[in-house]
Design a protein with these regions (language model features):
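Blade-loop segments of beta-propeller domains
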Residues: 70-113
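Surface loop/turn motifs at the tips and blade-to-blade linkers of beta-strand repeat domains
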Residues: 35-38, 79-81, 99-101, 151-156
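Short, conserved, GDST-rich strand-edge loop motifs in beta-rich repeat architectures
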Residues: 56-62, 123-124, 173-183
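Residue-level detector of Asp-centered blade-edge/turn motifs that repeat once per structural unit
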Residues: 48-51, 112-117, 165-168
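Beta-rich catalytic cores
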Residues: 41, 61, 105, 128, ...
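Short loop/turn segments immediately following beta-strands, especially the blade-tip
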Residues: 68-73, 135-144
């Protein structure tokens, strides 16, 4: 079921990046293909386990994380929002200078489930800074919400691409390109 949902979601969001059709422009189904309206430049997806929710990163100039409801294919901005309340974990992310809401520009994302069952989202961020931003996901409301808890700044001349959480709290990230655009 999860694999089917992931494949459907990947296919659906990839359709948004191809040449638009009349059905896609109106966000109506085109035969068996369903479209998701709203996310701009979707780059990566993460399924929120045991829920109808997907998180999509939108790598545009300002950039957002989007929450997609797989039941009706609707979407909404998840982060950054003016109402966001950060909770900086300075023990785990002491080298992080704090939240920066401007020019978010998210790229690769990875969602993990902790030993306590809580979800954590790791987000490669370009824009105002090159970093991996870390969020706790709150599933207690009608829709999930994010709380920013910290970041890991990229070393000089490193441009992250994808990120994955490792056992015992570590993370690994790929280096996409040099700041001048060379690979």
């Amino acid at each position: 079921m999860r694999l089917r949902l992931l494949l459907l979601s990947c296919f659906t969001l990839s359709c948004l990046m191809t040449a638009p059709s009349t059905a896609a422009a109106a966000c109506e189904a085109d035969g068996a293909v369903q479209f998701v309206c709203g996310p701009v430049s979707p780059e990566d997806l993460a399924i929120v386990p045991e829920s109808p929710w997907l998180i999509a990163s939108g790598m545009e100039d300002d950039g957002y994380l989007y929450l997609v409801d797989t039941r009706d294919y609707s979407s909404a901005v998840l982060y950054p929002l003016p109402s966001a309340q950060p909770r900086h974990d300075t023990v785990s992310y002491g080298d992080c200078p704090g939240p920066n809401m401007s020019a978010f520009r998210p790229h690769g994302i990875n969602l993990t489930t902790g030993a306590d069952g809580a979800y954590r989202l790791y987000v490669v961020r370009h824009g105002a800074r090159e970093s991996i931003e870390v969020f706790d996901i709150d599933m207690t409301g009608a829709t999930p919400s994010l709380t920013w808890i910290g970041c890991v700044l990229a070393p000089e001349a490193v441009v992250f691409n994808s990120v994955v959480a490792l056992p015992e709290g570590g993370i690994a990230a790929t280096h996409f390109q040099m700041p001048d655009g060379s690979v």
